[in-house]
C-alpha cells in the first residue's frame, strides 16, 4: 500500500480490511557527545516514520554499529533508545550488533494501522493549510557543535526537540489531515517537494511564520552549514520562487537537513486552529501554520513570501 514509488516515509503491507503493518528502518551517527541523549535522538528519529504514516509502533529492533572498546557508551546509547521505545508504547524485541570504528545506532520498527487511516505524503488538497510542528535548524546546529561553536542554551533546546516523539494525539488524527510527512534529511523544501509530486498543486510559504531555532544566524555566517543542507539547496532550489529581499541566511534554513525533525501536516483550513491547539497540548509549543496549498499550472511549485 506504500513503498518506494512515492518516496513514502515507511512501507505499508495490508493484512486485511482493518489492519496493515507499517515497516521502517533508520540509523544515524552521533550528533551529540552524550551517548544516552544520542540513543534517545536516534530512536525518536527512527520511530518518527511510523508516526508520519499515522501508525502506532508495535515493536522495535536495535541496529548497532559500535567500537568494541566503548561498551560503556553503548550501554548508555541502548538505555536512551529503550526509553523512547517505551514512551512510544512499543516493545523492544532484540537487535543486532556489528563491530565498527564509527558508532551508529538506530531501529527497525514495525507498526500497525487501519488501511483507511493511512496518511500519505503526497495527497494534499488545494486550500489546505500547512502546519509544521518543530523548529528547523538542527543540522546547522549539529555542525556548529562538531566545531565546538554551539552555545549550551541553543543546544539544550535543540536536544529537547530532537528527543521529542512525533506522536500525534488520537483526536488530532481524527481531523481532516489530507497529507503528512516528517522533515528529515531533505529539509523542509525537499519534503514539501515530495508532497507536491504527481499532482498539479504547489505551496505558498510565509517565511516569517516558519519556526526555527534561535541564534542560527551566527553559525550560518561562520559557515556552519552541513553538506547535506547545501546539497538540498542545489537539488531543490529550482522548484522555488522567492520574494525579493529574503536574506540568504534565512532561506538556507528551509533546506537544512534535519534529524528527528517535525511533522508537516496538510490539513483542511477550518480545522487548522484546532489542530494547533491539540499540538500545543501535546507539547509541540512552537507549532505554526506556515503556508497553504495552492493550484499551479506551470513553473516553480513552491513560493516563498
Per-segment meaning from a language model:
Residues 1-305:
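Helix-biased detector of long, well-ordered alpha-helical tracts
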Amino acid at each position: 500500500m506504500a513503498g518506494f514509488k512515492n518516496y513514502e516515509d515507511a512501507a505499508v503491507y495490508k493484512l486485511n480490511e482493518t489492519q496493515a503493518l507499517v515497516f521502517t528502518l533508520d540509523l544515524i551517527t552521533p550528533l551529540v557527545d552524550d551517548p544516552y541523549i544520542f540513543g534517545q535522538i536516534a530512536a525518536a528519529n527512527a520511530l518518527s516514520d511510523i508516526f508520519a504514516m499515522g501508525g502506532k509502533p508495535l515493536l522495535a529492533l536495535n541496529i548497532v554499529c559500535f567500537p568494541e572498546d566503548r561498551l560503556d557508551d553503548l550501554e548508555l546509547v541502548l538505555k536512551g533508545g529503550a526509553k523512547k521505545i517505551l514512551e512510544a508504547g512499543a516493545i523492544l524485541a532484540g537487535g543486532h550488533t556489528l563491530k565498527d570504528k564509527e558508532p551508529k545506532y538506530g531501529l527497525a520498527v514495525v507498526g500497525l494501522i487501519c488501511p483507511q487511516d493511512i496518511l500519505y505524503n503526497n495527497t494534499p488538497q488545494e486550500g489546505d493549510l500547512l502546519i509544521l510542528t518543530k523548529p528547523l535548524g538542527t543540522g546547522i546546529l549539529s555542525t556548529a557543535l562538531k566545531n565546538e561553536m554551539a552555545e549550551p542554551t541553543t543546544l539544550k533546546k535543540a536536544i529537547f526537540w530532537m528527543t521529542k516523539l512525533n506522536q500525534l494525539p488520537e483526536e488530532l488524527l481524527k481531523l481532516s489531515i489530507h497529507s503528512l510527512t516528517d522533515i528529515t534529511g531533505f529539509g523542509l523544501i525537499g519534503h514539501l517537494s515530495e508532497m507536491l509530486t504527481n499532482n498539479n498543486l504547489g505551496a505558498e510559504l510565509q517565511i516569517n511564520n516558519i519556526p526555527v531555532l534561535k541564534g542560527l544566524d551566527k553559525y550560518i555566517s561562520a559557515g556552519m552549514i552541513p553538506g547535506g543542507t547545501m546539497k538540498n539547496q542545489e537539488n531543490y532550489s529550482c522548484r522555488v520562487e522567492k520574494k525579493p529581499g529574503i536574506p540568504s541566511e534565512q532561506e538556507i534554513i528551509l533546506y537544512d537537513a534535519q534529524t528527528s525533525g517535525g511533522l508537516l501536516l496538510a490539513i483542511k483550513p477550518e480545522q487548522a486552529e484546532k489542530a494547533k491547539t491539540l499540538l500545543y497540548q501535546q507539547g509541540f509549543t512552537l507549532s505554526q501554520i506556515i503556508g497553504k496549498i495552492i493550484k499551479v499550472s506551470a513553473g516553480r511549485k513552491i513560493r516563498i513570501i
